[in-house]
């Protein structure tokens, strides 16, 4: 038996990059900053990949700074470096579930007393 489940909550680092394909599929990529327990630690950054309806929701409602929760799986994108010919790879979270967190005011760029760091 094998399990590949990733659950993250954090702030979006870039506005969603949406691509529409002739097949009708929709792909969205964005970055997510997830804080560590200590405020002195730098956040961990993750690349997220969303498809179809989930990608459309992200494109319509998620912006840089949005607080979101995601559940998905870890995959690796692989390619050959054009200059050196070296095989490279990078981890990507393939998102299956997207949750928009925080208040409407938080999503619209205002401040909120209900931000997770205040709990």
UniProtKB/Swiss-Prot annotation:
Which residue range or ranges hold the SSB domain? 3-102
Q: Which organism is it from?
A: Nostoc sp. (strain PCC 7120 / SAG 25.82 / UTEX 2576)
Show the PANTHER family listed in the entry: SINGLE-STRANDED DNA-BINDING PROTEIN (PTHR10302), SINGLE-STRANDED DNA-BINDING PROTEIN, MITOCHONDRIAL (PTHR10302:SF0)
One GO molecular function term of this record is: single-stranded DNA binding
One GO cellular component term noted in the UniProt record for this chain: nucleoid
Provide the assembly information.
Homotetramer.
Q: Does the keyword DNA-binding apply?
A: yes
One Pfam annotation reads: SSB
What keywords would UniProt list here?
A: DNA-binding
GO BP terms, alphabetized: DNA replication
InterPro entries the UniProt entry points to? NA-bd_OB-fold, Primosome_PriB/ssb, ssDNA-bd
Stated name of the protein: Single-stranded DNA-binding protein 1
Looking at the keywords, is Phosphoprotein present? Answer: no
SUPFAM superfamilies the record matches? Nucleic acid-binding proteins
Which CDD domains does the annotation name? SSB_OBF
């Amino acid at each position: 038996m094998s399990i590949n489940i990733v659950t993250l909550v954090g702030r979006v680092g870039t506005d969603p990059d949406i691509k529409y394909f002739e097949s009708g599929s929709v792909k969205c990529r964005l970055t997510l900053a997830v804080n560590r327990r200590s405020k002195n630690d730098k956040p961990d950054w993750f690349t997220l990949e969303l498809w179809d309806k989930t990608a459309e929701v992200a494109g319509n409602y998620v912006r840089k700074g949005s607080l979101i929760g995601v559940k998905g799986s870890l995959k690796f994108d692989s390619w050959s470096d054009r200059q050196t010919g070296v095989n490279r790879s990078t981890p990507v979270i393939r998102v299956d579930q997207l949750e928009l967190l925080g208040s409407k005011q938080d999503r619209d760029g205002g401040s909120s007393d209900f931000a997770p760091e205040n709990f």
